[in-house]
Amino acid sequence: MKFVFLIGNGFDLNLNLKTKYRNFYDRYISLPSKNSTIKKFKEVLSDNLDNWADLELELGKYANNFGIENENDFMELLYDIQDSLADYLDEQDSNFTVTDEDKKKAINDLIEFEKYLTAREFSEYDVFKKPNQATHFDVKVITFNYTQTYEKIYGWNGRALDLGNRRIGNSSYGTVMSLFEHIHGTTSSNMILGVNDISQIENEDLRNSIVTRRALIKTEMNANAGTMRDDRCIKAIEEADVICIYGMSLGDTDRFWWDKVGLRIAKSNARLFIFSKVGELPRRREYMASNKKDEIRELFVSHLDFDKPSKEKIKRQTFVCLNSNMFKVKLNYPENKTPEQIVAENADALTKVQKVLATIK
């Protein structure tokens, strides 16, 4: 069987990394800027933080503040945001280490994700799985994150990775991770930050500018990067028996990929799993989770320009899992100390340094 995982920021959040855009904004706004365009943007951002939950989508709207005559100013702003975000994420990434015990759990979650389903869902998936089982399981992972946390956990080094055997009944099946791709690059290479298509660039002049398109439209940026990672990811989705979406908001700026996933489910017997975090569900009324699951199915198909029968087929073949502990591992600091403990223990040294600096001034 062929499995494809699409991994989003929820993966890093589950590791307790502060990788939400809001976390980054606090840092970004505090950084000094000499450039007037960047300073003005930070003022706008600071006054409208609640409206900037989706940085990429809002950048497409913010393009309205520019024209062809000052397109270079817009490019400078985009590059400044990208560079600052990369630096911030590198700091978060550097804090992360993982134990062997957590690695084992993460590998087990990858090859036995169905354990997080309800008993009824597990039974339904088991019926689907039996006729599709082969001598081994092939896992391909597409991450939308820029960080290196996934590589640290799984030890990925660019070659097929043996994840061990998976027992089903009296049989044992080998499991291999054959592909791992940063579809939007990393903080150090081909980092892609942008919108799904030209319709999300609200300024018509910039929308038609090849310079802006190459800097802001994800599909064009990937094509121009020339790595062919987008082709490899599309091929993986087109051949998948099972597709799992984990930790992704199902937002508009990744609509290109929702279309590829939806097409595979609509045109085949493949199954889609969406793992999502929602508000706390009262244990007394856990049966009401079905409403939330239906909402998530509807959200997914709302991005697809498909006919109604195709959308209904996709919803029937989609499992939704809420608030699972999948990929939940600990964030380990040196000697298991938290950042707050480290700062507290070094408070005296920091005070001494500040006094010395004061005398120098």
Residue ranges and their predicted role:
Residues F41-E43, M191-E238, Y246, M288-R297:
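Acidic, metal/cofactor-coordinating or nucleic-acid-engaging core segments within structured domains
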Residues M1-L15, D231-K361:
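SIR2/sirtuin-family catalytic core signature
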Residues I183-S188, I198, M248-S249:
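Histidine- and/or cysteine-centered catalytic micro-motif in compact active-site loops
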Residues G185-M191, N325-K330:
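Short, conserved secondary-structure transition motifs
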Residues T175-S178, S189-N196, R283-R285:
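Short, charged, surface-exposed secondary-structure boundary motifs
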Residues K2-L6, L15-H182, D230-E239, D252-A266, ...:
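Active-site periphery "cap/insert" segments of enzyme catalytic domains
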